[in-house]
Every structure is written in C-alpha cells, then in structure tokens.
From Swiss-Prot:
Secretion signal, residue range per the UniProt entry: 1-21
Topological domain spans for side Extracellular: 22-153, 403-1302
Subcellular location: Cell membrane; Perikaryon; Endosome; Cytoplasmic vesicle, Clathrin-coated vesicle
This protein's record includes keyword Membrane: yes
Family: Belongs to the astrotactin family.
Membrane topology: Multi-pass membrane protein
Keywords from the UniProt entry: Cell adhesion, Cell membrane, Cytoplasmic vesicle, Disulfide bond, EGF-like domain, Endosome, Glycoprotein, Membrane, Methylation, Phosphoprotein, Repeat, Signal, Transmembrane, Transmembrane helix
Source lineage: Eukaryota, Metazoa, Chordata, Craniata, Vertebrata
Name listed for the protein in its UniProt record: Astrotactin-1
Role of this protein: Neuronal adhesion molecule that is required for normal migration of young postmitotic neuroblasts along glial fibers, especially in the cerebellum. Required for normal rate of migration of granule cells during brain development and for normal cerebellum development.
Amino acid sequence: MALAGLCALLACCWGPAAVLATAAGDVDPSKELECKLKSITVSALPFLRENDLSIMHSPSASEPKLLFSVRNDFPGEMVVVDDLENTELPYFVLEISGNTEDIPLVRWRQQWLENGTLLFHIHHQDGAPSLPGQDPTEEPQHESAEEELRILHISVMGGMIALLLSILCLVMILYTRRRWCKRRRVPQPQKSASAEAANEIHYIPSVLIGGHGRESLRNARVQGHNSSGTLSIRETPILDGYEYDITDLRHHLQRECMNGGEDFASQVTRTLDSLQGCNEKSGMDLTPGSDNAKLSLMNKYKDNIIATSPVDSNHQQATLLSHTSSSQRKRINNKARAGSAFLNPEGDSGTEAENDPQLTFYTDPSRSRRRSRVGSPRSPVNKTTLTLISITSCVIGLVCSSHVNCPLVVKITLHVPEHLIADGSRFILLEGSQLDASDWLNPAQVVLFSQQNSSGPWAMDLCARRLLDPCEHQCDPETGRREHRAAGECLCYEGYMKDPVHKHLCIRNEWGTNQGPWPYTIFQRGFDLVLGEQPSDKIFRFTYTLGEGMWLPLSKSFVIPPAELAINPSAKCKTDMTVMEDAVEVREELMTSSSFDSLEVLLDSFGPVRDCSKDNGGCSKNFRCISDRKLDSTGCVCPSGLSPMKDSSGCYDRHIGVDCSDGFNGGCEQLCLQQMAPFPDDPTLYNILMFCGCIEDYKLGVDGRSCQLITETCPEGSDCGESRELPMNQTLFGEMFFGYNNHSKEVAAGQVLKGTFRQNNFARGLDQQLPDGLVVATVPLENQCLEEISEPTPDPDFLTGMVNFSEVSGYPVLQHWKVRSVMYHIKLNQVAISQALSNALHSLDGATSRADFVALLDQFGNHYIQEAIYGFEESCSIWYPNKQVQRRLWLEYEDISKGNSPSDESEERERDPKVLTFPEYITSLSDSGTKHMAAGVRMECHSKGRCPSSCPLCHVTSSPDTPAEPVLLEVTKAAPIYELVTNNQTQRLLQEATMSSLWCSGTGDVIEDWCRCDSTAFGADGLPTCAPLPQPVLRLSTVHEPSSTLVVLEWEHSEPPIGVQIVDYLLRQEKVTDRMDHSKVETETVLSFVDDIISGAKSPCAMPSQVPDKQLTTISLIIRCLEPDTIYMFTLWGVDNTGRRSRPSDVIVKTPCPVVDDVKAQEIADKIYNLFNGYTSGKEQQTAYNTLLDLGSPTLHRVLYHYNQHYESFGEFTWRCEDELGPRKAGLILSQLGDLSSWCNGLLQEPKISLRRSSLKYLGCRYSEIKPYGLDWAELSRDLRKTCEEQTLSIPYNDYGDSKEI
C-alpha cells in the first residue's frame, strides 16, 4: 500500500510536467533542457573599414597600432592569440555554452571610441539598450510563452521535491525515535486455573501475518467501527476461554500511548498505523462479543497462511475455525504492530518465515518471546528500508538533474596580428575569470579589471596583468594597491630571495644544514633541450619542483635532471632553463649572477659539513674529520692509504690483512684479530691491522686463514691440506696465469690463476714439467718459420709535426721486415683463482668504492688468458732517404740473392740451409764500406725470444747449444676477469669497474654508450673529462706530396664505441711570417669539417678528397689557395657531442717553390734572342718588353738561364735587355728576379727541370644542411653521394735533376 502511494505520488509529480510540456507544443523536453555550445566568429572589419583601415598596412608593422577595450559581463575566460599575419584583420571568436533558452540572451556590440579604441562588449539581453553595432543571437518566435511554461514547470517540480523531502525526513525521524526508545513488555492479564487447564493459548507468529493480511484486518476493523487492543509481545495470542478485565486493559493501552509508545517502538519497523496516533487506540472497541473483529482475524490469518506457507490451506482453516466455533467467550482482536505492511507489502518481512514456512503453535508462555531478526535493534535497517531510501533518492536526483540549469559561460578568443595590441589596452572580466596569455607570444602591457556583476564597480587586477614578467612564486595584489604600483608585487617562498636584477624571479638563499654525504651525488646525463645532447660550461644551483631540493644545470642550455625527471626536463621543471628557438636568452642574466666557476665553489657556498673542533666531529675510531664540504664525503674520511671497513667503523689497509667486519669473519676459520698500528710520521693517526688467528692447539694454515691441529701428522712429512701455490713468473708459459689488459695488449703484474704441479704434465720437445690444466700443441717445423716484408711507404713520423719536406728528394721511405716462428699453441683448461686475487676479492663487496675495484684491475688486469701462441719473432725497420734509393737497393738485393743462393736440388743447400735475408744485405753494405749505395739508409731490429735452429731466416743467429725459449707472441683468446667471481654483487661491481676502466678512465659509470662522469672528472671549463677523447694525428698525405699551391692532409677517424661521440673536426690554417719563429703568424682561418667543408659552404679552397666508409677510416682533405715557398701551420682538433676538443695535432710544412714550365721558358728565350738579334724596331722592343714583363719571377729565371746557356756569346741577358729596352724598362723586368728566396733561386739554376702532372680526385659538394649530432661516419661516403660528385684535379710538380720514380 505504501509503495502504491509512492507510485501515485510520483505520478502526480510527473503528470503536471508532462501536461506542461505537451501544452508548450510538440517539443521534446529533453532537448529544451540540454546544454549546448555555440561558436560565433565576429570580425572587426566593419569598424576598421569605417574608421582607419590603413593602420593594418603600415610599413612599421612591428609597433603597436590599436587600443582594445574588451568587456565580458558573463563568466568565462579571455584568450589572446597573436597568430595572424600583419596583413590580416583581427577577429573575435565567442564560445557560448548554456541552455538553449539562455544562449539567445547573449548580445555583443562593437564601437569605435573617440580616443581611437575599439570597444567590444559582451552583455545580457536586458543589460544594455539597443545600440548601433549591437548584434543579437537568434530568438525563437514564441519565447514569452515558453518562458511562462518554464516558470510554471519549475514551480511544480520544486513543490514535488519539497514533498518528497518531507516524507523522507518524517521516515527518518520515526526511525530514529524507534531506535532510541527502550522496549517494554506489557504485563499479561491473569486468568483462572480452570481456563488454563481447559483451554490452551495458541500463538501465531507475527511474521506469519503478512502485509496484505494486516491491511485487510485494519480495513475490516475500520469498516466495522470496532477497535481492538495491542499487546506488546512478539507473537499475536489467540486466547481461548480467556477472561479479563476490559477496564484494566483499556487503562494499560492509554498509559502506553501517553508514555510515548515505548512498546510501540519495540516492534520491527514503522507502519502506517503509527500515523493514526494514540487516539485510534484509545477509541478501540474492547467490548466482549465483537464478532466482526473475530472473523476479521480469522480471515487475516487465512490470507496470510495462504500467501506465505506451503501447508494445506484447508487444514489450516479447519484448525482455526474449530477454535473460534468452540469458544463462547469474547476475544480481543489483536493486530501485529510489525512495520512490514508498509515496508514490505509482498509479505517478506525478512524473518525465518521464508526458510521455515511451517506453522508452529506455542503453548509455553515463556517460549512466546522468540525474537525476529527484523526487530533486532542491532540491525534496524532491512532491505525494504534501503529500497525505499534508494527509490526516494533516485527520484529526487532525477528531478534535480533534469532541472539544474547549465551555467551560461561565454569564452572570448581574440585573434590579432603580432604587436597589434597597444600598451594600455584594457580587459574587463567577471570576478573569477582569467586572461589566458599562454598563446600570446608577444604580450602588451595591458590593464585588467574585474567586476562582481555587470553593474558592479571595476577593480583593477594587479596580479593578472603581469603578462610580461609573471611572478615565479606568488603575487601580492594588496601591496601593489597600497603603494600605487602598476602591478602586484612578487613575493618569494621561505628560503628564497628576490633576484637583484629580475624582481619577479626568486633565487634560493637558505640551504639548511647537511651533516652527512652530499645528497646530490648522482650525475644524470645532461640534455640539450633542443638537440638532446650533453655539453656544459658552468655549474649552477637551481631548484626544481619535485621536492628533491636542487638540481645542477651545467649550462644555460644544458641541464642535468635528477633520476626522477623525464628526458625532457623543461616539461616538468619550473625553471627558466628552457631553450627554444624564440626564447634562447630567457634567463641568461639571472644564471650568470648565480653561477659558480667550479663545483668546489658551489659546495663551499653551503658551509662546513661538520664541526671538527670537538669530539673529532662525531667521527669514529681512526677516521679523520674534515669540515670542507665535498660532493662524496660525509665529513669523516680515512687517512691517506687507508680504506673504510665494511661496517664503516674504522679504516684499514685493504692490501694488508683482512676485514673482520665484512660479515664473514674476514674469511678466517676461527679468530679475526685487530691491532692498532700508529703511523710512523704521525702518531695521532693509526691503521687498524686485522688478521686471522687460531685457538689453542691449532696453528694457522699456509693460506693465512685456515687452522690446523698442531698434533696432526701428514704422510711422508709433507704439508697438510692443499698443495702450496707456486709463483708462475719463472715457469715456462707462466704468462697464462697472469692477468691481461686487452687495450694495451700487455700482461699484468698480478697473478690471476693458481698454478699447481700435482700432475705429471709434460709436452713433446719440452723437458720442463708443465702446470696442471695446461694443454700444449706443437706446430710442425715446416710451418714455424715465416718471413714478411712490407711495401715501402712514406715514414709516418716524418709526415706529422715539423715536416722538413724537400721537393728535390721527396718523402723518406720506411720498410718493415719480420720473421715469425710460431712454435706452440697453448690452452688453459682448468681455472682456479690465485690466493692473491682471492684475498683481494674478499676485501671487496658492495660497500667498496669503484676506485678500489679499479686499483684491483690495474694490478691484475681486466682479462685472463685462455689461449695464446708462443714462439720466436724478429722484426727490422729500414729507413731510406727517398724511394729511388730503396728501389736501387731492392733490385740489387734481388740480383744478389738469385745469383748466389743455391738451388733446392744442390747438396750445398742441404749442408748450409742459411739464406741471405734483406736485413743481412743492408748490414753487409754498411760493413763493407759501400757508402754510396747506403747513403742515408739506417736499420733497427728487435727480437722476442731466441731464434730456433730450424729457422734459417733469422737475422740475429744464436748458438746452437742454447735451448730455444719460446715467448708469448699473441693472446688469441681472453675472458673478462669478473667471470671468475662467484659473488653476484661483487661480480656486478667488478664488471661496472671494468667498463669504467676501459671507457671512462675509472672516473665514471658506463650508461648505455656514454660515460656519466664523477664530480671530480670535470675540467676547469666545466666539461666532463672522464671519457678520454682520442687525438686525431694530422699528417701529410702518403700518396700526394705538397705542391707549390696545394697541400693534401689526412688523418684517421677514431671513435670508441662507448664514451665519446665525434661530431666534427676543426682545422686551423696559419701562415707563418717568420721562418725562425713559428709563433708569428699573419693570417688564421678555422674551418669546420662538417659545417664548412662537406656542406659546400667554403669548398673553393678546402675540398674533401676521401671520407670514411665501412671499410676505410681515413679522412683526406685538400687545401688549396696557398702561396709558394711559404711556411704554413695546420692544427686539427676532434670535437665530441659535449663540446670538448681533443688534444691538437700539428703539421708545419713549407710549400715547394713555384712551378715552372722549362720547355716554355726555353721557347721564350729563343723568341727573345730573335727579337734582339740585328736591328730591333720599336714594335719588336715593345713585344719583347710585354713578353718578359708578364712571365713572372720563376719563368724569368729559367729564361735568363737558357738565354745565357745558348746565346751568351752574343751578349749576356741582362746587358741585352738594358741595351735593347733601355734602363728603365730593363730595370722593371729584372727587378722580378729578386722576388724568390735563395733556395728557390738555387733550384732554378738546375740544368734540368722537368714538369709532371698528377691527378687528384676530390668531392665537389654543393651547399646542404649537415646535422652533426646525427652524423653517421660509417655511412658518410654514401650520404655525400647525394650532394657531392667526384671530380678530378690536375696538380703540376717540378722534378729537379733526374726524374723521380714515384
């Protein structure tokens, strides 16, 4: 019944709404109430055309042109975007959001004010009269009718909401009253013993009387004008033969009502009966003989049993009627007060009736107090109550959500050309709305006002107008008003102060105390915010917004973010370090003012790390206290030469003894002892010496850690335990047990592997016993002795540095000769760590610094040898003054060796297998005194081991009685030393130290393909120095000698796979003016290989000849436009991606003398003789003068030489010129002879000067953009094919005397 009433109530609520909607027309109500967004574009063209359109096309477009006054009476932000070209017209974009009924209320108007201001006002429909230029939005035709219906609709719905809320509050009040009322049981009426014996009281559980039954019972009682009382018991009693006093019961019920319904509150829930009050109870008809009440109770019980119990209804009805018909007394018609009739009309009261529907009659009065779970005060809310509350809340929410008006918001976006808005423009916004200048790249100095409503006063917003210099931390508008400032004052957070130059920025001035290690020890890779690289020049301290305290940018464009930041720190850091194309110098002055020249200066600004004046600064044992703040120091450091113990309780020498605090008792089997050893030079400092010991009756083993019983006897008197480890440095093939450095290709000093001789290990041809696990393979004799001789090449040492090049002799030549005898292949099968390495590793664990691991690698190497070859090797290097000498000696050697060497079939070959080697021939020339054949020839020889007697090619022979001692020739297979470590943590740290030692000089960590340098590995310029930058060696080309105007330079491109990324090479060219002092230069030119040479920017005088590819790493460069007979100095640097430069490499060379065509000079000499012979006319004189004047100094020298050689009998050249041309003209011609140096003058007097030409290929590149940070050197040759084409250049040379054989 209650749910039906609720449904009817909802129907009443929604009914008028539907009628109103229908009366308004055939319009969908949901469409009328939905939120919509409408965008309108408003152009300023009409007003600019009517007034002064010429301001948009002014030549000085960079200056502000127009004053704006924009006012918005609606809530919504104002956005200014200067994204238009200077020739485009400004326009407004209005984004109106709200109900469809509210959007037409928005009006706007544009007006040109007298002071030249463009006014744009957004206002309400009724907020301003209709003015010219006022544009309305679209309005529906029946707006007034809809407005009235909307008001009526809202009124009806408001009444429904209030009614529903009242019902809900009433239910909650009654529920609260029932919960806090104390339950009380009414005393049962007394009855006689005869009635107790003759009749039996049957109790029907109240849960069996469902909601429909109780409702019908109530209706029957009301219709019959009869009332019945209620007993405050859980079950409804049916009294058979019960006699009672009606007056007493009536008084009891009246007391119950006057007591506030305590028994009423003890029922399960509330019912609609409770709304009838106590008047109904007091008006009940309790007169005996009320048959209507009796029949109503029987019908009620019948209906309830049929609805809730599967028991046969006929049987139940018969049982009940037998009781009612046999009784002649009056019974009280009781109605259960359970609230399930209202809360659960379907009959589900939430009790055990569903689980146990069988009807039970109780005859024991004490059992009638069975309680229902629904009526338990611990669970007062059942499913029905929750359902009612949910339905009510849902209906209220539905009604409210369907009638909540969308707020009317108007967002204005002003699109203008750059610099169009003039300073002094004003914007008036509602309070709470903001001006968005994020897309306003060049904001003007505008004035902002805020107003509470469209008619309220304007208040100047001093903080919001700070568009050009927004406050970094916070803004105080009140201070600006009090001091009459144009903008609000910027304030800084606690611990910060204003920058002295930029008042709107803040710098930190309080850093607090830090006792302990410097908290920012991790240097992450720095990133250029544009290119993503790692250069740096200075160190700064700034804060970032992740709460970590500080970060250390290393330059204004390169930052080092902490580990928590992403690769692009500008997206998350509140700094002015952002470097963009349009904002490079955002905070340069501020950074300069707060910069530090070095990391030490930065750390000193934070004060001392500890107070060492008392109690050693809190440092324990033999730690020294230092107050200087270091990046990786806690203020407690160990004395020099000592390392901290694993528990940091003291310092010890890790090279001596053990560490008792390592958690493993120092590796000692029994005792680990400590002893204080003072320093001899400073008694205040001492070393904690730790060593192993044994208890009584035990002695220390040979390993210094194990203990053995003193009484223990060993067989045959030998030592107990493992066999003693022997040093392997005096053993054959002993290098196999030592460490190896795979970079330097040298054997380390420390023994890595244990060598024992417990097994009889011998090899064929060797008398000595070999260590255990060593496998030796002997190479056959016919494959042992091999000779190698290289092709003669220019001496590389001559081609670099100070090059004493002579165009007469050319390059000196170097040739290598080598004989190698590989005798044994050695392999190590068994690997066991030596005691020395074991002791060193045992002192290292996760708490040890990288420096300790690097020291171990320096001692034991980074690899251990697995396979190697042994034998004998002899090498000789032979230098020749030029290639002609080498050619003559080699041809002579071939003739001699072929003529004097015995044939393979002769008996002499068998008797004396010795053959003549080329080094022996060179030695014989020196010994025989044939100086003219060996002038300028020298030879140096080196040997490894002793030459075996089976090899006839050895230059230095040894006595046949001396046994051959094979030496280590080459390590063919090696493994990292960290693979020998079993502890995972120690192995990982040793591997990291190995990588750091190989690529980062031991002062940085390898991160992917780059080195993260330690704080101590930064140079004076602030650049990292841990990854050594390879030095390119600049040299003259080995193929093309310098000419009079051209030099070919080359170098090898070398880039390690980790730590360094070469991005460019810089070449400096200087002209030396003083031949004795090369520091005096006249001109200087610096060229970038990437930007100037291969890009084609300066290709006329510098051209690439060869670039690297996948096979070759040589870079060859052609330098043209040089002056003959001039000293030039070329300097080369390599540049990596951090901006570092490698150590320079120099080449100082003098260009050859000017090239002359001797054939042409002789022809000119013949021509001059013919002109001067006999009578010389004026025309012939002028021809001779013009010819000689245009020759130039070198050719004039050769003309003079040939003229005097052939025609001196008719007069010397100088005299003939003066006689034929006159002194003045002859002086002008002969003055050119002094332009050359004495060296070139001497060369031009050679009787024979030949001219030859050499072809040189080069790359002619047209201009293109080369990105150095994305340069792939291995693919450079392929990439340049797109912009460069191969061309040929002809180079002239002079050969003085006999022609060279190049």
